[in-house]
């Protein structure tokens, strides 16, 4: 990270990054930390750098992703009326006096929605550095060859947490959110082992919340084993439904891409 920031503030532009790994492994946290460091260092630097984070999973389309980028850059973008070319023109004017680092989370949500991907356009611009975040490294290698030849991202793999690391994370969350004694260390360890199998620490947060709500509904002050088991089952069902919905959306986007090509 230090090397990355040094490169950015020395030249005004750094190598593109592609952060990938399973859901809930800290990819977003890593990118946001880097952006925070850039904002802190930029105050002491002679090179003005704007750090922007956008979640393409929420913006969903290249247009709304670009619109959100410009809003975070300080441009007042109306909800309707602007076309993509106007957003791009405003972005190019922005680059006349500053560098920009853009982190695009869940980039797979927009990367195949047009023949000329937005990330390809952004990468062609001077003084622009991209941090792309996805659950799948295949998303970057499936970019058009001309985009890959210029993008040339540094790949950063976010490794899954160990059971002990997950337990520590969950314990910190419990200490901040629950009253002392609400859940035993034994049950916390059980949840951590389950989360380790799933590979997504956010699953553990949802299990804790669901288990706490079940205990509250039963008018109990402590979370019991049955609460945890029910919460795991409930959140596992919700997770499978979400995975199926994501797969359906992905297949739909691939079908649309083939039709365009």
What spans do the regions from the language model cover?
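Winged-helix-like regulatory helical subdomains adjacent to P-loop NTPase cores
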Residues: 221-261
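Flexible phosphate/Mg2+-sensing switch loops adjacent to catalytic phosphate-binding sites
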Residues: 41-49
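Mid-core helix/loop region of P-loop NTP-binding domains shared across ATPases and GTPases
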Residues: 31, 48-50, 57-169, 177-195, ...
């Amino acid at each position: 990270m230090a090397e990355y920031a040094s490169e950015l503030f020395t030249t005004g532009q750094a190598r593109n990054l592609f952060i990938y790994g399973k859901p809930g492994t800290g990819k977003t946290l890593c990118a946001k930390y880097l952006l925070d460091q850039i904002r802190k260092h930029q105050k002491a630097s002679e090179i003005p750098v704007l750090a922007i984070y956008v979640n393409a999973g929420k913006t969903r389309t290249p247009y709304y992703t670009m619109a959100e980028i410009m809003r975070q850059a300080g441009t007042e973008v109306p909800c309707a009326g602007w076309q993509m070319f106007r957003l791009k023109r405003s972005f190019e004017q922005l680059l006349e006096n500053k560098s920009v680092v853009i982190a695009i989370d869940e980039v797979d949500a927009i990367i195949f929605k047009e023949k000329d991907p937005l990330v390809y356009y952004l990468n062609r611009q001077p003084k622009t550095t991209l941090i792309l975040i996805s659950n799948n490294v295949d998303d970057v290698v499936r970019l058009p060859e001309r985009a890959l030849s210029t993008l040339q991202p540094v790949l950063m793999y976010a490794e899954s947490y160990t059971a002990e690391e997950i337990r520590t994370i969950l314990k910190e969350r419990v200490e901040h959110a629950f009253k002392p004694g609400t859940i035993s260390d034994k049950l916390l360890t059980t949840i951590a082992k389950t989360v380790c199998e799933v590979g997504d620490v956010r699953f553990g947060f949802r299990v804790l919340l669901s288990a706490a709500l079940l205990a509250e509904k039963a008018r109990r002050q402590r979370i019991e084993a049955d609460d945890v088991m029910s919460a795991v089952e409930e959140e596992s069902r919700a997770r499978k439904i979400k995975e199926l919905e994501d797969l359906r959306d992905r297949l739909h986007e691939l079908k649309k891409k083939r039709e365009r090509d």
